[in-house]
From Swiss-Prot:
Organism of derivation: Arabidopsis thaliana
Protein's UniProt name: CBL-interacting serine/threonine-protein kinase 7
Matching Pfam families: NAF, Pkinase
Modified residues (Phosphothreonine): 184
Domain of life: Eukaryota
Swiss-Prot/TrEMBL keywords: ATP-binding, Kinase, Manganese, Nucleotide-binding, Phosphoprotein, Serine/threonine-protein kinase, Transferase
Cofactor: Mn(2+)
PPI: annotated segments: 330-363
Sequence positions bearing Phosphoserine: 171
Chain residues that bind ATP: 31-39, 54
InterPro entries hit by this protein: Kinase-like_dom_sf (IPR011009), NAF/FISL_domain (IPR018451), NAF_dom (IPR004041), Prot_kinase_dom (IPR000719), Protein_kinase_ATP_BS (IPR017441), Ser/Thr_kinase_AS (IPR008271)
Expression by tissue: Strongly expressed in leaves, but barely expressed in roots, stems or flowers.
Amino acid sequence: MESLPQPQNQSSPATTPAKILLGKYELGRRLGSGSFAKVHLARSIESDELVAVKIIEKKKTIESGMEPRIIREIDAMRRLRHHPNILKIHEVMATKSKIYLVMELASGGELFSKVLRRGRLPESTARRYFQQLASALRFSHQDGVAHRDVKPQNLLLDEQGNLKVSDFGLSALPEHLQNGLLHTACGTPAYTAPEVISRRGYDGAKADAWSCGVILFVLLVGDVPFDDSNIAAMYRKIHRRDYRFPSWISKQAKSIIYQMLDPNPVTRMSIETVMKTNWFKKSLETSEFHRNVFDSEVEMKSSVNSITAFDLISLSSGLDLSGLFEAKKKKERRFTAKVSGVEVEEKAKMIGEKLGYVVKKKMMKKEGEVKVVGLGRGRTVIVVEAVELTVDVVVVEVKVVEGEEDDSRWSDLITELEDIVLSWHNDIM
């Protein structure tokens, strides 16, 4: 990668001064551009970290009606930033005329470019990328976010060659559902499910599953399964399943693709189902597959501090981004226990397993010994923390630290804890 311009030495010839963005980032070369935004390589002045900065022209987005897409992209990336295979958003800044999205740098470029260079990928390589894609999309679906534009150009690679899903500008968030279904045609035709193009109400997760089937075909074959300059003819092929598998694709991979490219979304193989197949599980790096979300939340990392949007909210730009960065009040209860910290820990572990959470224990030292049990399910992480103030006094805090837990599950958890409660403190519901 090209290095960014360095401050010039007094003895060196005069050069164009590096452009410093709002005193925080040194802008480098352009990485790409579109009709209303461009992306630059940049370096953090504070940390020296290389990042990508998407520079969005406010006037163009307002005139073209693209502001809802910008809002969705920011909100989706904010919600999903803890998954290792989803491109992270670090910070949002703004001036009177521009919005700056500071994002993780995917220095490996587009997966699409890799496929173009090689023609097709070995099945083991294609499977690894597909595993990471499925993991990222399942994570987003569990948080109610459907991507709706899954294609190789939106699948980036970091310097280690790991997949990073990007461009959530067409994503649908839970509040955009009507009767549980989406109703807007989005995406790129060759990768878009037939029910989306027909503008019927559709399940965003099932539509993403279709796109994943096309992606897997492209990785293994080097071409799309349905390709016709006449869109109507292409969709007739889709409904007839009119495509052919090359001889080098394994029987298991063919079966998965065939089931994911089912034109009927009701009978189409879901991402959850494909992740249970033996083909998918082969060579799966389990530790990598499940890492990141759980550990980061058990360690009580801030869920909002990486995004600063005060400027966005206060500017008279026509873009109303207020509310995107207001952290919702999390469920939390506190009580004095009638048992020891160790017993609280064991009880929390037992309850978590009973109620279907993934359980992780941890011990920390503060002023006294602190027992921490993390309970994870989908996008939601709950922490049970027991602090031994004295030998006889143990205070326990139960709180949702990431995602949201529905009222019935939260009530079940609190009810299960009742038999170790000596007294409840003032509650934060």
